């Protein structure tokens, strides 16, 4: 297994790059978001997910950060999602957007590129459970929002706390953290 590769980008294609690591060119499939950051000749470090397909061919999937890799791993555990479909989701949505779509039960965010209504519903349902079981520091939002960390430390459910905070932020966009926590506590205790 390969954990990560650091090398020079030699070639860029529609869904993958060729990464030169020690004079060996690796074909690494990446999301469109990663492709946008790639320039030929640049040095890059990618976290790697290795997959052996039906034809016994090894395929490498690269990610700029571990969070995107974790979301890929979660997506491929869902029945009906393969690596190609997961990469198309990650090309369309950032991990933060996936998290947001899941906690707000926004099935439409996942539709398109071969994903119909049933599969989109399965994605939101199954990821809600998986996201709620992730360690707090991996939920992405915690880094930006101390109010969520405070509510979780008080024993509130991560998804319910997130939804309450999002609602308060939309109603009171200029509220500081203390006000958000106070209003969220009121909302969650109803």
UniProtKB/Swiss-Prot annotation:
One of its GO terms (molecular function) is ATP binding. One of its GO terms (cellular component) is Holliday junction resolvase complex. Keywords: Cytoplasm, DNA damage, DNA recombination, DNA repair, DNA-binding. Residues 143-190 are annotated as: Domain III. HAMAP family: DNA_HJ_migration_RuvA. The RuvA-RuvB-RuvC complex processes Holliday junction (HJ) DNA during genetic recombination and DNA repair, while the RuvA-RuvB complex plays an important role in the rescue of blocked DNA replication forks via replication fork reversal (RFR). RuvA specifically binds to HJ cruciform DNA, conferring on it an open structure. The RuvB hexamer acts as an ATP-dependent pump, pulling dsDNA into and through the RuvAB complex. HJ branch migration allows RuvC to scan DNA until it finds its consensus sequence, where it cleaves and resolves the cruciform DNA. This is Holliday junction branch migration complex subunit RuvA. The lineage of its organism: Bacteria, Pseudomonadati, Pseudomonadota, Alphaproteobacteria, Rickettsiales.
């Amino acid at each position: 297994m390969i954990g990560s590769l650091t090398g020079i980008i030699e070639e860029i294609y529609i869904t993958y790059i060729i990464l030169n690591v020690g004079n060996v060119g690796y074909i690494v499939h990446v999301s469109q978001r990663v492709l946008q950051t790639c320039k030929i000749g640049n040095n890059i470090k990618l976290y790697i997910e290795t997959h052996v397909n039906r034809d016994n061919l090894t395929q490498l999937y690269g990610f700029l950060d571990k969070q995107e890799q974790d979301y890929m791993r979660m997506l491929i555990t869902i029945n009906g999602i393969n690596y190609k479909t997961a990469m198309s989701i990650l090309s369309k949505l950032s991990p933060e957007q996936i998290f947001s779509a899941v906690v707000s039960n926004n099935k439409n965010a996942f539709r398109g590129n071969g994903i119909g209504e049933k599969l989109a519903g399965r994605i939101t349902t199954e990821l809600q459970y998986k996201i709620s079981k992730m360690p707090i520091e991996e939920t992405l939002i915690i880094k930006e929002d101390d109010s969520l960390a405070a509510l979780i430390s008080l024993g509130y459910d991560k998804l319910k706390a997130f939804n309450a905070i999002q609602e308060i932020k939309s109603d009171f966009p200029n509220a500081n953290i203390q006000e958000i926590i106070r209003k969220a506590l009121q909302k969650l205790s109803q």
